[in-house]
């Protein structure tokens, strides 16, 4: 069985390490992988979000199973695209569809999902207008958390200590695009 692990972090190294010990694994590839995965298989010079490149590698290396670690390729629909590849023999894929991954890739979607289904979660407000957000932070309840809605590589959560600090954060996210589109809400 030929396997492809997508990602370059410690999580993907741990997955590749465990998979490499299986007797059914013939070849192990990682895209892009890291120094640790290089000793376990072959690192491919592909970014985890290079969906066309990954699809090409699946065909070129006759991949049977793809394990996707990072959230970004999941949110970009990698598993959905893999299921459409090679209709006669699509590769198996370990990872959710783009629709299912949305619960991780969109904080506003996740919080709304929990509210609709009665799942306990902290109170929240979603703003796509900077002016409305700035008006909201001027009144209690304090303290609160400012979160970028999209994927921000662990950098999208802020604990401001004052309305002024919260305003600076909101302006940086929504106007300055400090986290790109992740901070649009």
Q: Can you annotate each of these PLM segments?
A:
Residues 47-50, 106, 129-130, 162:
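Acidic/polar helix N-cap motif
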Residues 7, 127, 157-162:
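Short beta-strand-to-turn element immediately C-terminal to the catalytic PLP-Schiff-base lysine
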Residues 90-156:
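A conserved helix-loop-beta module that forms one wall/lid of the active-site cleft
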Residues 65, 120-123, 143-145, 161-185:
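Conserved ATP-binding module of the ATP-grasp superfamily
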């Amino acid at each position: 069985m030929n396997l492809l692990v997508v990602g370059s972090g410690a999580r993907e190294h741990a997955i590749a390490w465990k998979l490499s010990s299986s007797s059914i694994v013939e070849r192990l590839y990682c895209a892009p992988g890291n120094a640790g995965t290089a000793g376990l298989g072959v690192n491919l010079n592909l970014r985890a979000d290079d969906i066309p490149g990954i699809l090409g590698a699946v065909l070129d290396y006759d991949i049977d199973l793809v394990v996707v670690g990072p959230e970004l390729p999941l949110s970009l629909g990698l598993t959905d695209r893999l299921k459409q590849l090679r209709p006669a023999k699509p590769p198996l894929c370990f990872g959710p569809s783009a629709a299912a991954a949305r619960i991780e890739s969109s904080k506003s979607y996740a919080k709304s999902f929990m509210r609709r289904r009665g799942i306990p979660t902290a109170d929240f407000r979603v703003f796509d207008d900077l002016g409305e957000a700035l008006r909201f932070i001027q009144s209690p309840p304090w303290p609160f958390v400012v979160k970028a809605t999209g994927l921000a590589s662990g950098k999208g959560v802020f604990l401001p200590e004052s309305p002024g600090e919260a305003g600076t954060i909101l302006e940086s996210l929504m106007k300055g695009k400090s986290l790109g589109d992740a901070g649009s809400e």
